[in-house]
Amino acid sequence: MQPRKIVILGSTGSIGTQAIDVVDAAPHRFEVVALSAGGGNLALIAQQAVHTRAQAVGIAQGDQGALRQLIAAAAAAAGVRNFAPEIFVGPDASTRIAAIECDVVLNGITGSIGLAPTLAALGTGATLALANKESLIVGGALVKAAASPGQIVPVDSEHSAIAQCLRSGTDQEVEKLILTASGGPFRGRSREQLHDVTPQEALAHPTWDMGLMVTTNSASLVNKGLEVIEAHLLFDVPLDRIDVVVHPQSVVHSMVQFVDGSIIAQASPPDMRLPIALGLGWPDRVPRAAQACDWTQATSWTFEPLDTVAFPAVDLAKDAAKQGSTFPAVFNAANEEAVEAFHAGRIRFTQIVDTVESVLSEHSGSSELTVESVLDAEKWARARTLDRLATSAL
């Protein structure tokens, strides 16, 4: 069996670095042919390029000459001779890398800038292992229209869990999807208690080690709202049949309830290497991709309802998805700007979602969903959010 040829977008981020771990653990199954990253860590992507022997490397920003020198130095240190991958530099670098011939493109980019690479990957016919939920959320029908049935394989742990659970029944037998949420670092706090939380507290996630934006979104439950939209689009299940339940241990990653009342759950210790491996190998499983639950150790799994008063983001995301058009794009863009303002000390934590709600209330949508209308809506949302933040007081 020939190893699957893999392209990794966002290789220096959390998803990308763990994907390389997965490839290292199963070299007979996977072979990295290309990498891309933002360019903030040239030394790391140079090391990754040499380590994986990638044929092409892309960075959104940075100096091509400097990267080439770093690759040469890393190759010399590793004793690798005659290694000179093709290098792409510029805002479209990840899109060009995504179009390289391969079997699987893993999109681990953070944010809606992943939309163009997602569409490029789908255009090649390769399987898209999608960790960049924002591209599906803001692209919506555009992404679905570009994808062949089964071409998109989710990498988010919740959606990977649902995909596995759905193997237990037919589409007609599905009653509802149940996404689990850890509750984040502020679980159990009232809205009033959230007013004065700090950026440092928001980044102290109890389970996952992620980047600044995703970790903050997890604290506000915006991330779970985005995941509800993603589940709706991926699995064609109506929004009113998608529930969220808080599960602090993050062992049960999601569940599917069937029409006969049975519920199938996927459980494993929190480790993103498992859904990454499944995304790269789908529909096959990768042996020993991650540790299994240790049933010899005493443990308890608890579940509790989501406090939608303290954390209104999930309901707000559902409302945006129901309106469709460019509303999800506005939801995402406004949130990104508000999160940056929070970390800059300009607004309170609770003002993040309040600002998003306010901007959404002013949006009228687009008559036609195109890449251009999505980009225009995002531009409008970012500008409107910044206007509102300029008049916001702590």
From Swiss-Prot:
Record's superkingdom?
Bacteria
The residues that the entry says bind Mn(2+) are D156, E158, E227
According to UniProt, the name of this protein is 1-deoxy-D-xylulose 5-phosphate reductoisomerase
Q: Known EC number(s)?
A: 1.1.1.267
List the molecular function annotations (GO) for this entry: 1-deoxy-D-xylulose-5-phosphate reductoisomerase activity; manganese ion binding; NADPH binding
Function, in words: Catalyzes the NADPH-dependent rearrangement and reduction of 1-deoxy-D-xylulose-5-phosphate (DXP) to 2-C-methyl-D-erythritol 4-phosphate (MEP).
Identify the coding gene.
dxr
Entry binding sites for 1-deoxy-D-xylulose 5-phosphate: K133, S157, E158, S182, H205, S218, N223, K224, E227
Family membership, please give it. Belongs to the DXR family.
